[in-house]
Amino acid sequence: MIPGQYQIQPGDIELNAGRRTLSLTVANSGDRPIQVGSHFHFFETNDALTFDRAASRGMRLNIPAGTAVRFEPGQSREVELVDLAGLRKVYGFAGRVMGEL
């Protein structure tokens, strides 16, 4: 093995397999771009984003870890959300939950 070498098994990795997903239309009603990271509790995003907020409780963007989605002012786009996993306790973010979902 060469130092730093990767040994990757053949095949594909399916992200978030078996988790519930939801598609929502999200619009940026503000005057500045808004970027939302992969593991941000979508329910608690910037209030300038308009969407069915109640439906997004306990969910995050269904995108690879470390990536984000950017919403330009006036832009509307469809996003896919996925259920948060683990203990399903949410602390921090905008402070709208601060406990169990």
From Swiss-Prot:
It is found in: Cytoplasm. GO terms for cellular component: urease complex. It is an enzyme of class 3 (hydrolase). GO terms for biological process: urea catabolic process. InterPro entries: Urease_beta-like, Urease_betasu_sf, Urease_subunit. Pfam families: Urease_beta. Heterotrimer of UreA (gamma), UreB (beta) and UreC (alpha) subunits. Three heterotrimers associate to form the active enzyme. HAMAP family: Urease_beta. NCBIfam families: PRK13203.1, urease_beta. This is Urease subunit beta. The gene is ureB.
